[in-house]
Structure formats: C-alpha cells, structure tokens
Amino acid sequence: GRFYRNSLNSGCQVITVREELDIIKSYMTIINIRYNNEISIEYKVDENLLDILMLKLILQPLVENAVHHGRRQKEGKGELCISVQALDDKLMEVSVRDNGVGIPEDKIRLILEGGYKTSKSGFGLHSVKQRVELFYGIEDAVSISSQPGCWTEVRVRFSYKTDG
C-alpha cells in the first residue's frame, strides 16, 4: 500500500530524491513478487543529492517502462541500474538503464516527440519529458540511448539547488 500512497499523493508536486527512490524500492518489491525475483536493481546515487527536491514521478515511469517494455521477449534475468548524479553545481541527472530488448532509433525519435503510442495509458516517457521541461524550463531534458537487443538507457536532467 505504501507504493500507491506515496506515488499517488497528489498534494505534493516535488519530493526529495530519497523519497522518489523509496517509491522505486516499493515498486520493485511489488514487481519482484510478481516476476519471482527475476529483476535485479543496482543504485548508483550521489548521497549528497538525497535531500534535493525534485519533481515527483520522474523515475517511476522510467523504471516501469524498463520493466514492462525492456523485459518483454527477453530471456534471462532482468537488470536495472538507477543512477542519480550531479552534472555540475546546477544540473543533475537521473537515469534508468536496463538489459532489455532495446529500442530502434526511429522509435526513439517518435517517443521523444510524443508520436509513439502504446495500448497502455499512464505516464509515458513523452509525458515525463513534457513535465520536466515545463517545470524546470529546460529543453531536451530527456534523452534515450539504446542498442537494440542489448540495453536501453533513459536520462533526465534538471536543475537543482542545495541549501547554503
């Protein structure tokens, strides 16, 4: 129940990086129950960023996409790596990398432009891109790299402030 309470609490637009990661950990607990612990997850997090405020529900849709689209039609154990790093003293980047089926280049363009639709509704990559760009005023905030058949990495960059 904690996953749904945390992720759907609509009273708050921003949360700390730590809280966003807690949502991911709760989500992955549910997923690994469903998929019989077939997905391992590694966190590479700059501890200095844990109390930084960020727009809510940036990482969760990326992880959900990696699990549901990246793992489809792929044999073997799923692997995810979630990274939270400072790019400089004003920009940070969160990323999700999977060892799934990958995405062809033409499909990446469609996803980022909002022209790719799946049968499933909800927060998609284009929605994350729009929300981040609107909230932070950053163009091209989301990028996708992929090697079809091997991996996909989605990176989201945005500005941050530290106290002091």
Residue ranges and their predicted role:
Residues 1-145, 151-155:
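Two-component histidine phosphotransfer core
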Residues 108, 163-164:
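Acidic, low-complexity intrinsically disordered linear regions enriched in Asp/Glu with Ser/Thr/Pro
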Residues 156-162:
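C-terminal beta-strand of the catalytic ATP-binding
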